[in-house]
Design a protein with these regions (language model features):
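Alpha-helical transmembrane-bundle signature of multi-pass membrane transport and export proteins
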Residues: 1-430
Length: 430
């Protein structure tokens, strides 16, 4: 029991406790809304097709797959536009205040979604517009949210705090889709948006109770120089750059989550409730592996483990793409979550140890363009390929591409292959 309490040492800090509880609630609501939006677009476009002319021939494309892919595009454009600005704000302003205002915007967006859906005025274009606005708010929020953790706990408890924050996402991606699936199947999808609105209000109150006020340690101004400094540091630190490329390639080509409505509805034939259940597989795999890792001592040869975990992610995605069995699909999707968690923990350790605190917000913002831009572009890529060749081919080919690109990163960035554990990076920084 004492050892378990020690692993949750970060929760002893009052401010971090409020942050953690607020984020647990709002992240669950956000995952519910993410599920609902994907299913909403799928239902609005289901069974529709459109034709485009290219190279002298007509190509018939499925609207539902293309529409789901377009969600990725409308999410990634605001991330590219605002993520770097979010990093500068996180290093120059009170991170707590930035988080409050971005959540106010997110709550208003969810409220509008609720009203339009319940009143019957919702359409695909409205969903796209509100999704883009929500992505912009997230882009401005994430650097502050990730960077403030180091301000709320002592350095020796930072790793524990990061692990607990990872646990939030894993639990939310299990509970959120499952709850949303039940609500959509039994009641009205608009209620999911309404619940998300309420969760943002809870998060705003929790963040408002945090006593910490940001104190700028350096003259980090909101300007081009501060922006360029963060970009230069990230791109010149090769081991950080290599880990970001690994993340980007994996999520760009092997992001099967956006195709889940098609897999569940058309291939496996399990409907909205089955879609919600299938969506829990990846976070359950992530949660199980995360718990196992928390019970082990520090791993050795982490660079090779990182590369292997991304390769496993790609192989599991490929098998998921050609599966017609719900059990096999669930198992493979869970395996992608396991591989991603191992990769995420090692990548996060490398970046935190290699980045000075005064640059952390900007490093996070650059990483965000890879971490969040990859999946959203991946949704677009998968949607385009699936609309022409079908969802199974899109998912399978993406998994194979991930394995091949992982091999390229292993060759191009030998510092990743040679990385053993945190002591390697500590020695390099001394």
């Amino acid at each position: 029991m004492a050892r378990n309490l020690t692993r949750m040492a970060a929760l002893r800090y009052r401010d971090f406790r409020f942050l953690w509880l607020g984020e647990m609630v709002s992240t669950t609501g956000s995952q519910m809304q993410l599920f609902a939006i994907n299913w909403h677009v799928f239902q609005l476009l289901r069974g529709q097709t459109f034709t485009i002319s290219a190279f002298g021939s007509d190509i018939v494309m499925g609207s539902e797959a293309f529409g789901l892919g377009m969600l990725g595009l409308v999410r990634v454009i605001p991330i590219v536009m605002f993520a770097l600005l979010g990093g500068v704000l996180a290093d120059a302003l009170d991170r707590r205040r930035v988080m409050i205002w971005t959540r106010v915007v997110s709550a208003l967006i969810a409220a509008v979604l609720t009203y339009l859906t319940l009143s019957g005025q919702i359409d695909v274009n409205s969903i796209y517009l509100l999704t883009a606005l929500g992505a912009a708010a997230t882009a401005l929020d994430s650097p502050a949210r990730q960077s403030i953790v180091a301000n709320l706990v002592k350095p020796r408890h930072l790793a524990n705090a990061i692990s607990l924050n990872t646990l939030i996402f894993q639990i939310a991606t299990i509970c959120g889709p499952a709850l949303a699936g039940l609500l959509v199947a039994q009641l009205n999808i608009g209620l999911v948006y309404g619940i998300n609105t309420a969760t943002f209000v809870v998060a705003i109150i929790a963040i408002g109770l945090i006593r910490h006020r940001g104190k700028i340690k350096t003259a980090a101004n909101i300007g081009w120089r501060a922006l360029i400094d963060g970009i230069r540091f990230t791109f010149r630190t090769r081991i950080i750059m290599g880990t970001m490329l690994l993340d980007f390639f994996a999520t760009l080509f092997a992001s099967a989550r956006t195709m889940l409505p098609i897999v569940a509805g058309d291939i496996l034939g399990v409907g909205a409730a089955g879609y919600g259940l299938l969506a829990t597989a990846q976070p359950i795999g992530a949660l199980l592996v995360g718990l196992i890792m928390s019970l082990r001592s520090e791993m050795k040869r982490q660079g090779l483990i990182l590369l292997l975990s991304v390769a496993v992610y790609g192989m599991a995605t490929a098998i998921f793409g050609i599966s017609t069995s719900f059990a096999l699909s669930y198992l493979m999707f869970a395996l992608t979550g396991a591989g991603d968690t191992v990769s995420m923990v090692i990548r996060g350790t490398i970046r935190q140890l290699m980045t000075p605190d005064e640059l952390r917000g900007r490093m996070v913002s650059v990483n965000m363009m890879f971490f969040m831009g990859g999946p959203q572009l991946g949704e677009l890529e998968a949607g385009l390929v699936a609309s022409v060749f079908g969802a199974p081919f899109a998912i399978f080919s993406g998994g194979v591409a991930t394995v091949l690109l992982t091999a390229w990163v292993a060759w191009r960035y030998p510092s990743i292959r040679r990385y053993n554990n945190a002591d390697d990076l500590k020695a390099k920084r001394r």
